[in-house]
Amino acid sequence: MSESNPTNAATAPRAVRTGPGTPPRADAVSARGLALHGARGLVYGPVDLALPAGTLTVIQGPQGAGRSSLLLTLAGRMVPDAASELRVLGHRLPAERRAVQRAAAIAGFAGIDDLDDGVTVGDTVRERLSWLAPWYRRVPRVDQRTFRDLALPVFGERPLPRVESVVWDLDEVDAMLLRLTLALAQRPRLLVVDDVDQVRDTVRRSTVWSRLEAVAATGTTVAASVSSLDEVARTRWARQPHQVTLATGPHAVPAPDAA
């Protein structure tokens, strides 16, 4: 079982007003009965979702609840059960998943966007920019100014790593923020971030959450996962995020606000 807070979503996009005098906007993600089964049974779901565009959603759930798989489904990288109804950024999934893949970026996923500890920050960024550029365009070496322009929206007032720094020397917060920077180089409309609590210290993790809030404030829809079921309650937010609690898998627990 899974529970979404706020309300469950209908299949059709829901109009959301952002403030007085502003036109309504559709949800970036809407789902009904979204679920995924694998060879060993239920991976996640069923869950209903309504994630407004330009907001932060925290997906909470214990190990085995399917947090990573749910995020990859929203980003068009995994295909849900056939009975699921899912629309992301105006596209029906899985039929239009290529369009979603172009507009959705991922970060924090073990085995997918891991950093190479033995290379420099500059070379890491250059490799990412080369991947995003047309095949015929040569990407020059990344200097500190180029990196600053790319990373400033993510790092904010936090001091930037030097481009000559080796990834191995970055602390866990800077490493996570670098992964976010690489993902946002795609200029996505949707960013999904897995396992935010790989930054183990609660106080230091709050820095990552504040930067994800800043990203969402620019208009990018952000969905990020964490295993701690009280993460939202004990984190100080500039604006209360949306919350989805997954309670599937071998360690199933009821959602905090379940009756």
What are these regions (language model features)?
Residues R17, P23-A39:
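Conserved N-terminal strand/loop that marks the beginning of ABC ATPase nucleotide-binding domains
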Residues Q60-P62:
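The feature captures the beta-strand-to-loop junction immediately N-terminal to the Walker
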Residues R67:
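Conserved lysine of the Walker
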Residues A75-G76:
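Helix-to-loop junction immediately C-terminal to a conserved catalytic motif
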Residues A103, A110, D117-R137, T146:
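Q-loop/switch helix immediately C-terminal to the Walker
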Residues L180:
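Hydrophobic anchor residue at the start of the ABC signature
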